[in-house]
Amino acid sequence: MTLLETTVKECLNNVVKQYASQTALIENQSKKTLSWQQLQQEVESVARGFLSMGLTKGDRLGIWSANSKEWIICFLAAAQIGIPVVCINFHLKKRELLDLCRLTGIKALCFSDGFKSNHFIEVINYLSKKASKNKDALPQLFISMGNQQAEKSVSLSQLKETSQKISDKAYQHAIEQVSVKDLLTIQMTSGSTAMPKGVMLSQYNVINNAMLSAQRLGVTHDDVICLAVPLFHCFGLSSCLFFALTTGCQLVLLDNYNAEDVLKAIQHHRCTIMHGVPTIFSRLMKHEQFSHYDLSSLDKGIIAGASFPPALIDDIETILGMKGITISYGQTEASPCCTQTLPNDALEIKRHSIGKPLPFVEMKIINLKTGKPVPVGILGEICTRGFHVMMGYDNAPDKTKEALDEEGWLHTGDIGYIDEQGNYHYAYRIKEIVVRGGENISLCEIEEAIAEYVGVDATKAFGIPSADLGEEVIVAICVQKGYSIGESELREFLQERLARYKIPKELHFFTEFPHTPCGKIDVQALKLQLGYGVSIKDEKNMVAG
């Protein structure tokens, strides 16, 4: 086994050579399909269109849209000619998008009509007016991928019409300038107290990470992935789009996660693979119409992105029938996968570990104070090194130095350990520790204890400042439909399981949690609902994917 030295363009060419007439993409909503050969033709047309509009290698393209074939076409077209893509969260509002454009230096912006109540056209019109006076800081080209046009935008069809202006020689020259080590994408990480950081990933990073993760999962060109996670997120980009690009498998695109839509898509398209954060899987199995759908085609997938109760793996294997489910650990800075269990690993391994490192991935656990490796079974910081580690943070050399040491090790900020079998275990984020009266309290430990109580659907613990003790623990609890939980009874339950100083100061009950587009609990929205705003703790929750 060796690492690939192929660009995105070469990956697409290889897939087309083998599976030209096989379906590459299906849009679940529109039912539109593209074969691999048709996808290649669309990508080439848009790439030529970008060149005709004056974009060149190194210019940055933003994509602001929900999952769609146009999203994929524009991304691959940009990658072919060395234009890095800034993947934009479709929930961003006007001010956030403006800040993001200034932060990343986006020169052109592809956009759709909007997402739910977030209407993009109004924002694009505002942005285009500001852009004329800020040519160095804001996009100068706006490309509509949807049905609506902004005031100063060109449509994707108009862009493709200009592609004939680019000769074959000029197009080939642009392609030949692209290297596997060139910047492919800038992925924005979320932060609770500061501007987000732009993680720079190369074509080499993402292609090889996807290839090795897909191999561990056992993906072939016969597989069909139900793509229910956002493409703007590294999990969706690598484990879905680039799984397809390195194996020739088929993608079924959903523009938004909705449990019933996912159930329908799996049944109709006979999907064999589904990836997601724990919430996606648990919501699916709890849907009132779950038993009405035939999900027998589902075979394997990846669960990542957040901690989960061990029983969830049992349910995924027995209720969903996904015997090949794997657990993956990583973060955006690692392209994103570092470790992954095997599809045929014993349930005990899947319940409690995050598996072994992918091939060519180095891992170690170090003592936080000395920086030296710790023995088997001892907690320390998880560090990783190899082909998958990011190029750095965009325009943030100081932040890059904090994350990457002189020997190339990425310090993940996660605490874990390795067992005697070589499996890694995730414990908690370094910043998911609350110090109450001098005592260190693991928020994960509290969440896991509460999760054992009957009727609890999900939990989120966080720290708040305390004038007396430094910090106190607050817990939000989502109650399962049909259940009622009494606070006094729950406190009695916790007193039998946790030391007195670990008992939360406040327990808050919800019927539903706010979630990010990736399916994770939206911690900042939750804090705002409880009246605490941003806590002194940075809970980025970059556990995986």
Q: Locations of the language-model features?
A:
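Conserved AMP-binding A3 loop
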Residues: T33-Q37, L184-N208
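Conserved pre-ATP/AMP-binding loop-to-beta segment of ANL
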Residues: E5, S21, I143-N147, V154, ...
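Structural core segment of the AMP-binding/adenylate-forming
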Residues: I81-Q158, K481
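Conserved AMP-binding/adenylate-forming core of the ANL superfamily
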Residues: L4, S21-S68, I72-L76, K93-L98, ...
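AMP-binding/adenylate-forming catalytic core of the ANL superfamily
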Residues: L92-D99, F111, M274, G386, ...
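Gly/Ser/Thr-rich phosphate-binding loop
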Residues: E161, C271-G276, M285-I349, E362
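Conserved AMP-binding/adenylation subdomain of ANL enzymes
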Residues: I207-V224, F232-I273, H287
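AMP-binding/adenylate-forming catalytic domain of the ANL superfamily
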Residues: Q140, M145, A499-I521, E539-A544
